[in-house]
Amino acid sequence: MKSMRTFLPSASAVLAVCMLASIAQAGISGSKHDFGQFGWAKNQICLPCHAPHNTIVKDANGVVVAGPLWNHTLSTATYDLYYDAAGQKVTGKVDTNSMLCLSCHDGTVAVDSFGGGAGTQQLTAGLLGTDLTNDHPIGEAAVWPNPNPSFMVDPALRTAAGIMPLRNLADGRAAVGCTSCHEPHNRKGTLHMLWVNNAGSGTTVDGRTVSGSLLCQNCHKK
């Protein structure tokens, strides 16, 4: 019994450490978006994307920037978005939120290009380029209402649930964007910074019970 009494506190301590480690994984600190460890970021986590003063209000086309107090140089690239059912390539604009993500992830702007300065550090991991035809459609290629609404969940339900939000194009139309699936500040602590763990099972926002692909099925009725 003495050895058992010795073991139980030890097991509890291990469990507590594991729980704390799991909690610590959520949030931007220590995530792939934590650039504070690099000298070019001046050891500040937020600065490459946000700043308190003299920030970017509009892009080169006069479109109001979606990100609050945005500090990173925006891309001016044009994107190939998707191949439609007829095999035609959709080339167009992305939503204003995705423009912020692509200012690093399309590879046309250096990661350390912020605060009005020209950077030299090019993104290597997570590089999408400007040809997005092999990625989930976003922006003008993924506008709601969908041509097949019976296969899609009403976006009002998703937004009300606080997950999978639609984003706005410059003309005000709602569309799927990068941040419909990804939470860039890693608040959920999930793989690939997703709003919902896609390996999970459970109840979707419209009440369907699904087994696996929970993130996908919060939008797609399958």
Model-based region annotation:
Residues M1-L8:
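N-terminal secretory signal peptides that target proteins for export/translocation
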Residues S22-L47, A51-K222:
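C-type cytochrome heme-c attachment and multiheme electron-transfer modules
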Residues L8-P9, L127:
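Generic structural signal for short, flexible, solvent-exposed coil/loop and linker residues
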Residues S10-S22:
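Bacterial N-terminal signal peptides
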